[in-house]
Amino acid sequence: MKTFNLPLLVALFYLFVSVARSQGPIDITKFGAKPNADATSALLAAWKEACAAAAPAKIVVPAGEFLLNAVKLQGPCKAPLTIEIAGNFKAPADVAQMKGEDTWVKIENVQGLTITCLPTGGTFDGQGQAAWKQNKCAQSGMCNSLPYNFRFNTLTNAQISGIKSLNSKLYHMGVMGCKNITLTGLTIDAPKDSLNTDGMHIGRSNGVHATNSKIGTGDDCISMGDGAVDVHVEGITCGPGHGISIGSMGKFANEAPNTGIFVKNCSFTDTDNGVRIKSWMNSFEASASDLHFEDITVTNVLNPVIIDQEYCPYNHCKEKTPSKVKLSKISFKNVHGAAKSAEVVKLLCSSAVPCDGVELADIDLTFPGGAAVSQCKNVKPIVTGKQNPVACGAPATPAAP
């Protein structure tokens, strides 16, 4: 009499069910996407199917040029999800066609997202040239009236690689409320005179790695707002733009602290700033600590190393009381190269809450036009290694707006 191995049968049954549930790649052309035509509804349909899949799913964007209007790709999804992009997308040039949306491509509330762009694809052209003329930030101080290229909101365990973001109407990328997210191999590009086209803005996120990317914009290559914790920025080539900035801090009440930020092995060419920490005058109380900048190379940079606690762009500060943002445990190590101005180091700290625990180590910065100077105010840094120019050789003067 034959006997049956019940545990084996049960295992085979569940294996069969798992295989039955799995599916091949979900190609957006399955939903009607065609090159040189609008792929918005097709991408949304592909996302809906992939997000509902019980097993890990993959969305495929084949080679070709596609038009894309504003999309929201929202979770939660039932399983991890991958988007593989061989094609390229263009946004509407006319911002009115985006119907008031604050973002071109918004992805949010997803665990286990992977975006991989093949060498031939992954270009997202925001076509921001016309929109930049509508930017009234300098006049009104209202700087969020145009859409980002991307917002990555509340993503957990995400891997994003190879995106090429061009000509965003406002910021290229926002990373908000994320946990354990890596963004690598990015190309971010907009002209140096494009207003407020920050390459990447990180806020209220924990465990962010931004690595091995080339960023050239009309604003900060990377900026970090409040609540940026355990952020690692490494291997970034920045220029043109305004450098890599922590802040501006203190503009709003109840900002979350910034802590554990590491910027390493980055180079800056033809930028307004290199590495910068900034907080508003007449600010609310806030804090930032454990901020470290190391192995920094500058070429023709206006302010290679700067702490600016008298930040007030466009002269919009009605009062000019000292900043209440407390800065502590900060280091600048192995910073070298040639500056565009004589003021190569400017540590302009608040008189209300002077900076604590600032370290300058192995600074070698020159100004081809004459003698370089290191300026300090309301700070007594710890100085080690080579110091060219002499650390804190002059009092700090206000930074250029």
Curated annotation (Swiss-Prot):
Disulfide bonds: 221-238, 349-355, 376-392
UniProt cross-references to SUPFAM superfamilies, sorted A to Z: Pectin lyase-like
Entry keywords, A to Z: Allergen, Cell wall, Cell wall biogenesis/degradation, Disulfide bond, Glycoprotein, Glycosidase, Hydrolase, Secreted, Signal
UniProt entry tagged with the keyword Transferase: no
Keyword Signal tagged: yes
Catalytic activity annotation: [(1->4)-alpha-D-galacturonosyl](n) + H2O = alpha-D-galacturonate + [(1->4)-alpha-D-galacturonosyl](n-1)
Gene Ontology molecular function terms on file: galacturan 1,4-alpha-galacturonidase activity; polygalacturonase activity
Active site feature: 219, 242
Signal peptide (from-to): 1-22
Domain of life assignment: Eukaryota
CC annotations in GO: extracellular region
EC numbers for this chain: 3.2.1.67
GO biological process, one term: cell wall organization
Glycosylated residue positions: 180, 265
Cellular localisation: Secreted; Secreted, Cell wall
InterPro entries, A to Z: Glyco_hydro_28, PbH1, Pectin_lyas_fold, Pectin_lyase_fold/virulence
Role this protein plays: May function in depolymerizing pectin during pollen development, germination, and tube growth. Acts as an exo-polygalacturonase.
Family to which this protein belongs: Belongs to the glycosyl hydrolase 28 family.
Protein's name in the database: Probable galacturan 1,4-alpha-galacturonidase SALK6
Organism: Kali turgidum
